[in-house]
Amino acid sequence: MFKTADTTQQQRHSGPITDRKHMRRYVLIMTILGALAVGLTFGVMTWDNPAETGSRPWWLIVGMRRDSLITIAVVAVCHAVATVAFQTAVNNRILTPGIMGFGSLYTVIQTTAVFLLGVGGATALVGVGPFLLQMAAMVVLATILYTWLLSGRFSNIHIMLLVGVVIGGVLGSLSNFMQRMLTPSEFDVLTARLFGNISNARADYLPYAIPIVLVVVALLWFRANTLNVIALGRTTAQNLGVAYKRELIIIMALVSLLVATATALVGPMMFLGFLAATLAYQFGDTYSHRLLFPMAVLFGYTILTASYFVLRHIWDAGGAVTVIVELIGGLVFLIVLLRKGRL
Amino acid sequence: MSITLTDVQKDYSDKVQIGPVTTEIQSGGVTALVGPNGAGKSTILTMIGRLLDIDTGTITVAGQDVVNSPSKAIAKILSVLRQENHFVTRLTVRQLVGFGRFPHSRGRLTIGDEKYISEAIDFLNLTDLENRYLDQLSGGQRQRAYVAMVLAQNTDYVLLDEPLNNLDMQHAVQMMKQLRRAADELGRTIVIVLHDINFAAHYSDKILAMKDGKVVKHGTPAEIMQNEVLTEIFNTEVNVIDGPKGPLAVYY
Ligand SMILES: Nc1ncnc2c1ncn2[C@@H]1O[C@H](COP(=O)(O)OP(=O)(O)OP(=O)(O)O)[C@@H](O)[C@H]1O
Ligand SMILES: [Mg+2]
């Protein structure tokens, strides 16, 4: 009799994983994704290397590809983690930082830099200082934009989205206006900066980007339990004692840091994070951010490396990776939106 | 130690003003908040629960100012459930109720927490449904799951906005009996918005009647259950008769 009481007590638990089946599924998916990630990484590194295996040039090529892969990993971490955290904060699984005007913010900052400094100034703007300056500008502006949008000033999500899109549009025209006054060579410099490209990502930024990303992700990881509660919405979170407004500002600042880092590396991407997060919700089926984050990251990394592998090694169009991923992500976005039928 | 409201006011617009309200809700026992639609019951309740900013005035719960005290500390003495609830996260009943322990566990559930969770679930007869997802429940079952979450929070003060919404007769009576028990046996203070005046009269110790943003009456059920008083509050002809279990308001 005591034994039955004991076993029922054991079965009654409340964790983020509901039962053995759920656990098995989560582990299985993570294993498959992990294997795919390792396989693709290996494939990208070694496939079709023209030099003799093991020779110096061979290692050189592998090293260059390794830099691309590290960039991909950083970008995947940034977009996946940022999008999951952002969607938790806005309590909506359609909106992303990109949709809410982040890309336009980046464009306006870059355009302003070229506009004010000219070709000479802008091309001189490489290295740590300018990188950090540009990051700081993006983070500050994006944090202000997002916390303002989320301040509860807008009674519903539609108005908030509309305001976000309009702000994006206004910033876009502002950039357009400045771009018209640039000389052709200035415009060239600018276009090179605006278009995302993994093949010639700014790998020299990696030594600064990686520590930033590691610290931000660690901070979000430690806040994961609070994020789980925030996902329940404002009033429930407040009832449970979360300092809601303060937490939102912190989350938005961390999200902005991540997206700004990824954008500085490869340019704006709107839908990669959406793709990774949506797949993680679907396959993870859990409220726990500690389980969602790793899965979203693996999805993001696998998708990016797979596109990179196919486009670079098979179709010889390495520059188009971000474009193709955005195309797929945008389509998935539309499908999800149409199937849900609401925001 | 009780809930006190001093000159509490909320101005939604020039026309819609709630308050000023000055009153004291006794600790221990059940206080029912009644009144017509739009009277300001939810507004007052959510302000006590610090979910809505107060324009002027102060509210204290157990001596603590709800606006200025840390939200973390308030969450251990007061829990509040709103009229409408909706989550984007997909949760089972048990996971939802588990969140009620957050103020105490900060998300790391101990065996002790699991005990509170099981108790709250059993208390609301959700034991068989505990592993179901919320989107697989009926409206009334979901409503009970929300109340279970608030009870698992195990606070001295519990504020509930129309928790009988969607409940059938059996479950409405059960819930009121359970809330009564929580007040009598565990010494909880329960403030509850009710639309059924007969439920309010039978199960509560005090009734707080609101109309047009003001408190118009605050007293025992016997004081409120009068023809003129009820007719005045609800803008509709009410007759109080002697029922088998006390006064009964007939308004149809
Ligand atoms: N966010 C808001 N903005 C403007 N007016 C509001 C808002 N919320 C409530 N009101 C108004 O304030 C008044 C009181 O609303 P409240 O929700 O407190 O009423 P209630 O007594 O709970 O009514 P019910 O029985 O219908 O739940 C109503 O006239 C309502 O229209
Ligand atoms: Mg109400």
Question: Each predicted region: which residue ranges?
Answer:
Chain B
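Conserved ABC transporter NBD signature motif
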Residues: 57-65, 73-74
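Conserved ABC ATPase "signature" region
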Residues: 98, 111-129, 154, 159
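Conserved ABC ATPase signature
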Residues: 133-137, 141
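ABC ATPase nucleotide-binding domains
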Residues: 233-252
